[in-house]
Amino acid sequence: MIGRLNLITKSNLFKNVNNLNNKNYYSTCLVIAEHDNNQLLNSTLNTITAASKLGVTNISVLVAGSKCGPVADSVSKVSGVTNVVCVDHPTLEHSLAETITPIIVKLQSSSSKEGDEITHIFTPASNFGKNFLPRVAALLNVSQISEITKVKDAETFQRPIYAGNAIATVKSTDKCKVGTVRTTAFDKAPTSGGSAKVVSANDWAVPLIEKAISETNIKWESSEVKKSERPELTSARVVVSGGRGMKNGENFKMLEELADTLGGAVGASRAAVDSGFVSNDLQVGQTGKIVAPELYIAVGISGAIQHLAGMKDSKVIVAINKDPEAPIFQVADVGLVGDLFNEVPKLTESIKKSK
């Protein structure tokens, strides 16, 4: 009798192990890809790396856009990606929250029925991700975790608070963890070595899109794109930023020349943007763009905590300011106290001569 009980126990044990393998261990992180319908943006590669820290079984990537097939193909080659879901529809060209959200919610809600449950949904903490992810979290009735900078385990994450002056460790017990990833905190996933299968979801996604369009009457009106030969601000190796000390927008040409000499991008503090010196797409900081270049040159920037929150992870920080007590010098690796209108042209000329 005892032997039989042992045999039954072993049998049940194997069944339980199989059930665990089939249910608990088949967990998926769904990464929502940021792209321009032609190319995958680096922010998605950083987000995939964050997803790889979770210990989930699968990393699936949703590519939603218009004529975005080439993007889906490139994602399938990214190391660590196991599945690619592609939804191609003209309305998705601009990733409107009203049209992309139902697709994500449907993917998550139907995943548990298929035994491969989506336990995490990650997307870059950019304007792209911030636009729709709060809707996703609300519809799934879960709390969103914003600006994830470290994945400790599948339930525990770190994120900056108080303009980056403190790091909060948060634990989520939600069935599905929904979060935006601060891309500067993670390396880019290798763009080769993967062989994921690309699956079209148009058959069930298109009706959802058309329903969303009819119910919200949403449509894209227009966009204004500024062409620049300089690298994109968030991915530039070198960033030269100016603050209120630049005095006017015309003086930013001085920084543009320095940035071009170094092959970098031009940024600005909120004070410079609010003063009308430059457009807000150049703003670096808590309410602007988060950057972490190899070299960050802050010119005429005092160093408000909101600005520091957007650039303090830069590898090398150089500050040029005439005020020796400026807070920016507290985080700078190299500081130059002097008149920027004298020092910046000298620096630019010296770099040109050294080339």
UniProtKB/Swiss-Prot annotation:
Belongs to the ETF alpha-subunit/FixB family. The electron transfer flavoprotein serves as a specific electron acceptor for several dehydrogenases, including five acyl-CoA dehydrogenases, glutaryl-CoA and sarcosine dehydrogenase. It transfers the electrons to the main mitochondrial respiratory chain via ETF-ubiquinone oxidoreductase (ETF dehydrogenase). GO terms for biological process: fatty acid beta-oxidation using acyl-CoA dehydrogenase. SMART domains: ETF. Binds 1 FAD per dimer. The keyword Cell division does not apply. FAD binds at residues 295-323. One of its GO terms (cellular component) is mitochondrion. SUPFAM superfamilies: Adenine nucleotide alpha hydrolases-like (SSF52402), DHS-like NAD/FAD-binding domain (SSF52467). This is Electron transfer flavoprotein subunit alpha, mitochondrial.
